[in-house]
Every structure is written in structure tokens, then in C-alpha cells.
């Protein structure tokens, strides 16, 4: 007898977990460069589309079949009886789609850590391998009646089964792939490669946070009893609390560590809290959830810094730290904070070391298994079709080289990519003999007694543009050209950080005002501009003065002073 309430609950959860693909897409696109956006979105689409038939044909049977404690059975198309594993009142196909979207989540985690330099063909193949074998076998150990579940291992919604599996694959993949071009200087120090759209990343975080209520909440797979309803309420509350506390702690920690609260790290902290609490959201109290969230908030920062600076593993989005490290840590910490309502009591609640030991064993076992299998997969790909694109393709961007897509932002001007490989030695200019030097011809600005033309170029803050225009009008300047530019000075100010790495050069928005004068004294223009722009702070601007040989008005053909006059 099926339960309509339970089935709707499971299907609603499946829909929410499916929509996490949109959240992952936005996060990964925002944390990476614009030239790879189309590739990122394509990968997140295809790992789901490839993973779905793979899990249907092979993965589901391996994961939930009643084979043995290590592996299920081979059941192409899901045609056998799964009554031994189905939740009460939930039909097979509802349970199957719920598990399919979980499998796709694990596969998509890898995309971010290997972004911007992976061959699309290789990505499609290893995504299939994750859905066919890697995720289902470890999932059988945990959720399919395998040896870990028989020992009492508790991973309620997948801190280890989903997230750590994806995180370990991401770790091995990013290590074997190598860092992006320009990520590390010749001295080995990491360089900040800024994400192109943190607005996208923020939207992705909110989508994921919203969908996580389905990811964790619907894992009760029931809502037809007081116990199930009570458990769902606790799960929702703990899920939200851990993420919120993690964000607050990361904000404070980065504020102290870097001098300012780090935006991208705080985004990562939200996901770290969600990932970490997933294993024990049904088993810990709100106090335990808050403490765990605080730990995740500190650990995520230290983990990102470790992989960037010590391990030198280039992870553009922090997937290894968020899903791998915090997924493992959250599973182990469940062995500390479990209150006994749905599992054994944790160490801090008088349960002793047994449950903590089981949790730790499960994490280590799954990590080791996944690391071995995915290393084999990546090694085969590397030796055959190749894992990484060529340097020229990487520099040009994967949108155009992998997909023939000129840009994902048609109609928008894109900022040039200024990160390059500085490992190639640069030729040092030496002295040239006088006999070989190019002759310098000095031409006087004016030779016929005509008026002198001078170009005055003013670089200033955008906020001072109106004041400058008004001041120029007041002294008789009626023509100017205004350009929006990016730039930075040579002065050394307070360092800025992106994901814990000092940003080498920050290009700030400025305006460039070009004025050509003849009768208005140059000194008057310069002094007026100085008076208007001066604040006494770094960044007031610069004024450049040039001689102009001639001026030509295109429409009339007039030259010299006449070309400067209004009609």
C-alpha cells in the first residue's frame, strides 16, 4: 500500500535536489573567468544527463541490490525486486529518481575543482564512471545494506556518500591535472585569479541553500507519522543553523585574518556548513549543529589556504575544501555530537568511542576506495585521450576552443584576461651601439607661428567627473572626450585578498578626460583640475600634458585652431 504523503515528500525532495544543479552551475561560473562560462554550464548540464542513464542502467542495481555487503547486483533498467530497501509507502520509481539526483550531485562536484583546463570529452567520460561504479559501490556500503551500514555507520543524507566522494574525486583530479596557467609564479607563490561574477556565485549559494532543505529534509523519506514530522523539523532547523553560523564565523575569521571580510570565503562557508551538517542533521541537537557550523567556518578558510599555498592544488571554487574536507569532518563530528535520538550516542553525550570509531573508519575507507578507483580512471584518460587542454586553448578560453562559442555574454564587452604564464624567461634589453641606434628626429611643435595646441589628459575617480566638467565649463572649456578606463597606481597600499591570496594588482574603475586647448592657458586648466580633484588621499588622479602637432575636423576638413571651434 503506497502512501501519497510519503511519495509526494520524496518527489518534492527529488525536484529540489535536481535544482541544485543550477546552484552549482552559478557558483562555478561565478568563481571562474568569463571565457569559460559556457564550458562550465555545459559540464553541469551533461554530468546530469550522462549520469541519469548510467545510474538507471547499472548504478542503481549496484547500489541498492541485495548482493552482498560490498556490492549489490547488476540490474540493467531496474527491473528486479527492491522491496528490501524501499521506504515505507514509496514506489520504486519515486525512490529511484530521488537517488538519481543524489548521484548527479556527487558527479557535478568534481567540475568546479577541475574547471578552466579540463578536456570536455574527458569530463564526460569520468562523469559516467562516477555514476556507473564509484558512487554506487561506496553508496552500497553506506545506504544499500553494505558492511558500513551493518556496523552502524551513520550518514543521514550524504556528507560522505555524496559530498566526500565528489570531493575526493575533485582532489585527485585537480592534483593530476595541475594548476591553471599563471596560478603560481616562478617563486611558487600562488596568484589570485579572480572569479568574474560573484553575483552569480551568490545566487548559486542561495539556490543551493534553498535546495538543501530538500536534500536533507526529504531524506526522511516519510512524513506520515509524528516521529517523521518531528525529525523533519529538526533536520530543517539544524541544516539552516549550521550554514548560518559557519557564515558568521568565517566572516569574523577572515575579517581578522585579512583585514576585511572575504566575500568568496563566506560564500564557501555557507556550503561548508550545509555539507558538514548533512551527515548528522537528524542526530544532533541545535547546539551541536551550531558548534559544528562554527568549526566548519574556521576549517573552510584554513583548508582553502592549505590547498592553495601548501599542497599547491589549484581548486578555483573550493570544492575540495567544501565537499571533501567538510564532508569528512561533518561525518566524524556526528560521532561526537549525536544525542542518541536516531543513532548511538556520540562521545560528548556519553556514548564512548565506538560510534566515533565507526564514523572515522567509514570516512577513511570510502576516501581510500574512491581515491584508488578515480586515480585509475584519470590515469587511463591521461594516457589515452588526454585530460587537459593545450596551453593555447586554455589561454583562449574553453568556450571558444571546446565549444566554438565566442562568448557566453554576447553583446557585452569582456575584460581581457591578464593572467599569463610567467615561467617563460623574458629577454632583457641591453645597450645598443650608437652606430646601430635608430636616429631620433626632433620636430618642433610649431614652425609657422600658428597657435600652439596642447592636450591635457586627466585620470580621476568617476565620482569627481561631474565636478570636473562643471569646473572646465566655467573656465571656457566646451569640448572634452571622456572614456571609462581601468587602472592602478604604483604606490603600495594595503594589500587586498581573494580567497586568502594577496591580489597582485587591482584595476579600479577610473575616467579619462581628454581636453585639447589653444587659447585657454594650460596652467589654468591644470590648476582648476587640481583644485577640483584634490582630497589628499591616494587615488586623486593624475594629469598629463602633451604637445599636439595639429588638429583636423573630419566633417569640414578644417585644421588647426579653426578645427577646435564650435559651429
Where are these regions (language model features)?
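Positively charged, small/polar-rich N-terminal and surface patches that mediate targeting and assembly
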Residues: 401-406, 419-567
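Glycine- and aromatic-enriched membrane alpha-helices
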Residues: 1-446
